[in-house]
């Protein structure tokens, strides 16, 4: 029993360190890494680990995802709640490791588009890399006894396919190439191939002959520079490899390197990199052992010898780049635009981070600068290409989006200049400077550089990185730390090295004198070594308010005896503590109440962050992802400081008149406006804003250029301006908003929103929402959707009626809802003629299977009686039924003539067998079944999805007699999709198949609407596919997950083998080879990878 208690406590400790849970297969490993032992579930009497976990629900919460993956989460415990809180809030030197946190905004992961950005060019075809660097596919070593490299049948020859080559905007002729399915990319090129002259020139550069032992033929491998887009990633990999080699001074086998790399950085090392080490003398030294084996030894680079040879020669400064020649303008080319005009266009576009339609540029330009827009500018968009990026939609010059050009980083400018002058010169110069620094360091281990420059902190590129909030003085300067392998994990590694260096180096002594700005290594509590910076000093101590731990963002009093000079080698990592600005709170950034609320909600806690603007102090939105739903911290803080005196405080048993019902939801929930001080002040402000906009010319500064969830702005509806809060951003054009003062939710265009004028902003955002959420008392709650007829009758009876009355029976503070009796003007204050009683006494409800409303029970009390209700006059039920019938006849119109169920779009275009096709994989079950979309058509689907959201959000809900195997529009997760109805369930749900994304979903039948003809033009984008080149009768769950991880939600190149046509576009099928060409130096053929995996799996089994 004691052992069981110990195991459960240790298990809880393991799970609590993983905020987003631990997958069941990883749980044993995580447990052992903490305790040194496995979970002894068999000794505890359970046949499996899962059975044991399910037996301790007080410790573990188990969830199963759609894919069947089981994840374990820690359950809350009163014993450890206080400890968890203290750990989260601590600001001591204790480190928080990156792998303890993995915050991701779930709401952001469900976006059906914008996963990879809008495709602006074709994907690199296998065999030809970006910038024409030749790809090198690793030669696998499995199954050589079967005559090929990857277990694919030797006679599986592919028909000739077309290879498209492109340089700049010039497209060369198609080059036919015959290849074997397992051929390495090195073997795809031959000097005899009929390539265009520019391409032949490129291939004829210095080539190194290389024998392919796989196909026994000579290939040519040009030595070319990797593209600029790959430089950053390669530099990161090289630095990591140097770190590994520095820890293994006696050498390391090259075959063992991937294992060490993955163990240290939790990331796979690309196999193609292993073949490039001999070309990286500045990173490592490669040695082939005398034993003659295939494995190689790697050593740290021999830099000192190279240094001497460099320093012996005279240092010649590089000559300046030649000035570009002034060429006369070519005949027929349009004249260049004036410089000041281009500057103004660039300044204007900078305000539109999501781009601006070219057709909207003249008006925005004239609104902003009050000068006439040049007439010929739109006809000559190419002349603006030096100040903006032009994205032509579908190649149509009349439809283009203009984006502001971001300034190039310094290293990119240097790289471009170096390439113009010569790659060799710039490489020599950088190597010389780097080696000079190393030589200076090597001369004396005690030499410290006082003015060492620490590189700036790079903002993470991932969609929603995790941050730890440290402290804040105002919401425009919130101190945070990024959590992740390149941030907190790298910092951990550095601090371990600092501890080893300062603890074991007797020559290192404490500083004798200190000065402002000096960087120090501080021996903090618990024997941790941290970096700190001095701003001011006082006698023998360093003033607390001016000594900051640069990686943690807080200050501390320390003795000089604990301060040491910081070795320059610990200055390569950026300071980890940085600042951010909370979006939407700028106008109240210094408000003491707001600062107090933000501090109480955020300090010491980890959040997912959405970065809106990348700047020195980035603009962000924080999300708490610890609960079932993601909580917008910015919006929560803004609501918390609303003026409570302007709220409508409802009192139990009180009667309120002149109440206006503003919204009725499909579950019977109502939103009401009750006369109060806040409503009067809001109406006055909105009238002033109306007058302000009427008198002032509407310029571009009032257009919303940066929408984000939680932002409060204005929307013009029914002749007046209303407050709305953005609740969901679908795309750069469409988003969902909620009217704060009516409770209505709808989808609108971004261009229809306006910023609140600055003079009214502070006043209007502190007024609480004036829509009060209510429900009808004595009616069953939590029954789901009401019947359409009842909702229609209720809306027709009370919606937007300004003189209704209510009596409050209960206020549920936790749910934020009031239980009321609702009266129309004619029936007030008769309790037996309330809306509540009329609904519960109607026979119409009894004919609905999905609604369970019955006559009011004898125990239910009326507003004026405690012993039950008096019978309603006999004709009231008949009158109600008659009013329902009239409302339905008036509200429901037969739209069947507007929608033809027979009209279907043409089938989506697929490449012919043997040709390439750029595809995107939205869904992957296993190699035998996955779904592809044409990559080049995704932007068209994106536009269609936006239009559907806007169309159906304002369309009247129609009652559809659905039929199986027919095409409809259905709302799935706040978005409208084109679907095929697969089945009708008895519980009010229907099974649908998304025709553009290939997913099967269950939706409420009320969310199914006719598909308008305007949305039947674009071909259905989802095509069922099967992977060629590999066969397996039954794919295991493990193999399926491996396949999904490599292809799902990724753009790939497909080589079409077979197209199986069908009369129904959703029944078409294609058999393809898939190639991942995202890396410039490697083609990953998915069927080869899966073949290797099956072989390895068979060996294990």
From Swiss-Prot:
Q: Give the Tudor domain ranges.
A: 513-573, 706-763
Compositionally skewed regions (Polar residues) per UniProt? 127-138
Where are the residues of the annotated region Interaction with CDK17?
864-1101
Q: Which PROSITE patterns match?
A: HTH_OST (PS51644), TUDOR (PS50304)
GO terms (molecular function) for this protein are: mRNA binding
Q: Per the database entry, which stretches of residues form a coiled coil? A: none
What is a biological process (GO) this protein takes part in?
Answer: lens fiber cell differentiation
Q: Which residues carry this modification: Phosphoserine?
A: 319, 862
Out of the domains of life, which is the source? Eukaryota
Q: Which UniProt keywords apply?
A: Cytoplasm, Differentiation, Phosphoprotein, Repeat, RNA-binding, Spermatogenesis
Do the record's keywords include Transmembrane?
A: no
Provide the primary localization. Answer: cytoplasm
Query: Where do the record's region annotations for Disordered lie?
Result: 126-147, 859-880
Q: Pinpoint the HTH OST-type domain residues.
A: 3-76, 233-302, 337-406
Q: Where in the cell is it found?
A: Cytoplasm
Do you know which CDD domains this protein is assigned to?
LOTUS_1_TDRD7, LOTUS_2_TDRD7, LOTUS_3_TDRD7, Tudor_TDRD7_rpt1, Tudor_TDRD7_rpt2, Tudor_TDRD7_rpt3
**Phosphoprotein as a keyword?**
yes
- Interaction with CABLES1 as annotated region, ranges: 896-1101
Xref: Pfam families: OST-HTH (PF12872), TUDOR (PF00567)
Q: According to its record, what are the GO cellular component terms?
A: P granule; ribonucleoprotein granule
The similarity annotation says: Belongs to the TDRD7 family.
Q: How does it assemble?
A: Found in a mRNP complex, at least composed of TDRD1, TDRD6, TDRD7 and DDX4. Found in a complex containing CABLES1, CDK16 and CDK17. Interacts with CABLES1, CDK17 and PIWIL1.
The entry's function note states:
Component of specific cytoplasmic RNA granules involved in post-transcriptional regulation of specific genes: probably acts by binding to specific mRNAs and regulating their translation. Required for lens transparency during lens development, by regulating translation of genes such as CRYBB3 and HSPB1 in the developing lens. Also required during spermatogenesis.
The UniProt entry, under PANTHER family, shows: TUDOR DOMAIN CONTAINING PROTEIN, TUDOR DOMAIN-CONTAINING PROTEIN 7
Q: Report the protein name in the record.
A: Tudor domain-containing protein 7
Q: Per UniProt, what is the name of the gene that codes for the protein in this document?
A: TDRD7
């Amino acid at each position: 029993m004691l052992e069981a208690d110990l195991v459960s406590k240790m298990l809880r400790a393991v799970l609590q360190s993983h905020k987003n849970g631990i997958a069941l297969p990883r749980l044993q490993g995580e447990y052992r890494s903490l305790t040194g032992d496995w979970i002894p579930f068999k000794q505890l009497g359970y046949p499996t680990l899962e059975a044991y976990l399910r037996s301790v629900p007080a410790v573990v919460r188990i969830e199963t995802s759609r894919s069947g993956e089981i994840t374990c989460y820690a359950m809350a415990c009163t014993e450890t709640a206080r400890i968890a809180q203290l750990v989260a809030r601590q600001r001591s030197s204790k480190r928080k490791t990156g792998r303890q946190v993995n915050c991701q905004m779930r709401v952001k992961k469900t976006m059906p588009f914008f996963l990879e950005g809008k495709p602006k060019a074709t994907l690199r075809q296998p065999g030809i890399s970006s910038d024409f660097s030749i790809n090198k596919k690793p030669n696998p070593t499995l199954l050589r006894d079967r005559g090929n490299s990857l277990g694919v049948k030797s006679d599986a020859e592919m028909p000739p396919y077309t290879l498209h080559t492109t340089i700049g905007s010039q497209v060369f002729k198609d080059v036919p190439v015959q290849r074997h399915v397992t051929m390495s990319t090195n073997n795809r090129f031959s000097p005899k191939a009929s390539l265009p002259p520019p391409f032949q020139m490129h291939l004829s550069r210095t080539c190194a002959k290389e024998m392919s032992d796989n196909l026994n033929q000579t290939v040519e491998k040009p030595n070319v520079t990797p593209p600029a887009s790959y430089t950053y990633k390669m530099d990161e990999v090289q630095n990591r490899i140097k770190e590994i080699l520095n820890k293994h001074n006696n050498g390391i086998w090259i075959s063992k390197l991937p294992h060490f790399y993955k163990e240290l950085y939790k990331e796979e090392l690309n196999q193609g990199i292993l073949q490039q080490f001999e070309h990286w003398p500045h990173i490592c030294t490669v040695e082939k052992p005398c034993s003659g084996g295939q494995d190689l030894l790697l050593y740290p680079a021999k830099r000192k010898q190279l240094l001497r040879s460099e320093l012996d020669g005279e240092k010649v400064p590089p000559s300046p780049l030649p000035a570009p020649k002034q060429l006369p303008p070519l005949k027929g080319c349009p004249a260049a635009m004036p410089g000041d005009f281009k500057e103004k266009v660039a300044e204007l576009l900078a305000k539109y981070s999501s781009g601006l339609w070219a057709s909207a540029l003249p008006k925005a330009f004239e609104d902003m600068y009050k000068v006439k827009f040049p007439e010929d500018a739109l006809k000559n968009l190419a002349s603006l290409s030096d100040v903006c990026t032009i994205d032509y939609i579908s190649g149509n010059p009349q439809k283009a989006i203009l984006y502001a050009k971001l300034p190039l980083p310094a290293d990119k400018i240097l790289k471009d200049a170096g390439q113009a002058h010569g790659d060799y010169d710039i490489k020599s110069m950088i190597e010389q400077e780097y080696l000079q620094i190393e030589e200076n360091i090597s001369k004396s281990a005690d030499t410290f550089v006082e003015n060492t420059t620490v590189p700036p902190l790079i903002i993470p590129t991932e969609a929603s990185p995790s941050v730890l909030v440290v402290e804040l003085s105002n919401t425009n300067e919130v101190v945070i730390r990024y959590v992740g392998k390149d941030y907190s994990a790298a910092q951990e590694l550095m601090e371990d090295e600092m501890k080893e260096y300062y603890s074991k180096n007797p020559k290192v002594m404490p500083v004798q004198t200190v000065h402002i700005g000096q960087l120090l290594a501080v021996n903090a509590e618990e024997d941790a070594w941290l970096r700190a910076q001095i701003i001011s000093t006082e006698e023998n101590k360093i003033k607390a308010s001016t000594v900051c731990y640069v990686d943690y963002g807080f200050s501390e009093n320390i003795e000089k005896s604990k301060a040491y000079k910081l070795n320059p080698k610990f200055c390569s990592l950026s300071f980890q503590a940085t600042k951010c600005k909370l979006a939407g709170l700028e106008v109240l950034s210094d408000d003491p109440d707001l600062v107090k609320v933000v501090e109480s909600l955020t300090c010491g806690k980890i959040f997912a962050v959405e970065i809106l603007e990348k700047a020195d102090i980035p603009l962000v939105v924080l999300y708490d992802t610890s609960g079932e739903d993601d909580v917008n911290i910015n919006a929560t803080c803004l609501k918390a400081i609303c003026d409570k005196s302007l709220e409508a405080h409802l009192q139990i048993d009180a009667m309120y008149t002149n109440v206006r019902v503003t919204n009725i939801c499909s579950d019977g929930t109502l939103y009401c406006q009750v006369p109060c001080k806040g409503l009067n002040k809001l109406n006055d402000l909105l009238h002033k804003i109306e007058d302000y906009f009427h008198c002032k010319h509407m310029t571009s500064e009032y257009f919303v250029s940066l929408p984000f969830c939680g932002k409060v702005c204005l929307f013009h509806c029914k002749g007046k301006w209303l407050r709305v809060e953005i609740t969901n951003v679908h795309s750069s054009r469409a988003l969902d908003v909620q009217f704060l003062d009516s409770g209505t939710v709808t989808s609108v265009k971004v261009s229809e929103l306006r910023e609140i004028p600055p003079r009214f902003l502070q006043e209007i955002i502190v007024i609480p929402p004036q829509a009060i959420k209510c429900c009808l008392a004595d009616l069953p709650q939590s029954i789901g959707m009401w019947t359409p007829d009842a909702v229609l009758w209720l809306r027709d009876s009370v919606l937007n009626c300004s003189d209704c009355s209510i009596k409050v029976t209960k206020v549920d503070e936790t749910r934020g809802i009031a239980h009321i009796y609702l009266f129309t003007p004619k029936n007030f204050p008769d309790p037996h003629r309330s809306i509540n009683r009329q609904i519960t006494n109607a026979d119409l409800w009894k004919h609905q299977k999905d609604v369970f409303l019955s006559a009011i029970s004898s125990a239910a009390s009326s507003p004026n009686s405690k012993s039950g209700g008096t019978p309603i006059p006999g004709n009231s039920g008949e009158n109600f039924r008659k009013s329902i019938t009239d409302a339905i006849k008036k509200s429901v119109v037969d739209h069947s003539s507007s929608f033809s169920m027979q009209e279907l779009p043409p089938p989506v275009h697929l490449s012919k067998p043997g040709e390439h096709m750029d595809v995107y994989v939205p869904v992957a079950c296993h190699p035998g079944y996955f779904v592809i979309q044409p990559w080049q058509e995704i932007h068209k689907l994106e536009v269609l999805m936006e239009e559907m959201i806007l169309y159906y959000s304002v369309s009247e809900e129609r009652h559809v007699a659905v039929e199986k195997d027919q095409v409809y529009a259905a709302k799935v997760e706040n978005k409208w999709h084109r679907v095929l109805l697969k089945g009708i369930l008895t519980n009010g749900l229907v099974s649908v198949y998304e025709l553009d994304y290939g997913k099967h979903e269950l939706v409420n039948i009320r969310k199914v609407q006719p598909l308008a003809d305007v949305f039947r033009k674009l071909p259905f984008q989802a095509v069922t596919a099967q992977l060629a080149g590999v066969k397996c009768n039954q794919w295991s769950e493990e193999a399926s997950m491996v396949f999904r991880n490599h292809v799902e939600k990724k753009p790939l190149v497909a080589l079409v083998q077979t197209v199986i046509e069908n009369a129904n576009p959703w029944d078409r099928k294609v058999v393809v080879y898939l190639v991942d060409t995202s890396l410039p130096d490697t083609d990953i053929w998915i069927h080869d990878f899966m073949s290797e995996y099956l072989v390895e799996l068979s060996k294990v089994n």
